[in-house]
Amino acid sequence: MAKTFDVVVIGGGPGGYIAAIRAAQLGMKTACIDDAATADGKPALGGTCTNVGCIPSKALLQSSENYEHAGHQFGEHGIQVKGLSVDIAQMLARKDKVIKQNNDGIVYLFKKNKVEFFQGRGSFVKTGADGTEVKIAGKTAESLLAKQVIIATGSNPRALPGADFDETLILSNTGALAIPDVPKRLGVVGAGVI
């Protein structure tokens, strides 16, 4: 027997989780399905932006700006920093902490607004007079029946022909946000927000 909802949102990125929360705030019984998970299997809500895009890139940018300020601009204020160095592992750990705080914040907002979350991959089964049936493949196999379905499945990086991502020499945004050392040379193709 399928659980019944007014709205089911497939995708927990910025478009999906905001749509789910707003639908619930407007009084609709709402569910959200997303398959992104952390290394320990917990929900990684927030999509590309939160997990491997805007948020982590800005967290690393802030760390690098602080390093730059300490090395060049603090002196103008009479602050001398001796033995300044970069700890990439700590920068990456901080980035991961920022991501987790954002993931946990979305889970909290779902609970606060009574959005029922299902971890897994949603797919359409059939549409009938009662609504659309969506099957969830994930930790549990469940079916949901919804009057309305919002598809907010986000985006994926696109490799150039003949230059597939190997995350060693040719990096996607995911690989670029986990580089363990500062590269001596780096070329960037693309001009997206990440």
Regions found by a protein language model. Give the residues of each.
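Glycine-rich flavin
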Residues: 2-5, 21-28, 32-182
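Beta1/beta-strand and adjacent pyrophosphate-binding region of the FAD-binding site
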Residues: 2-15, 182-192
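N-terminal glycine-/charge-rich "phosphate-binding" loop or analogous flexible N-terminal tail
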Residues: 13-19, 23
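Mid-domain beta-loop-alpha active-site segment that forms a flexible
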Residues: 106, 193-194
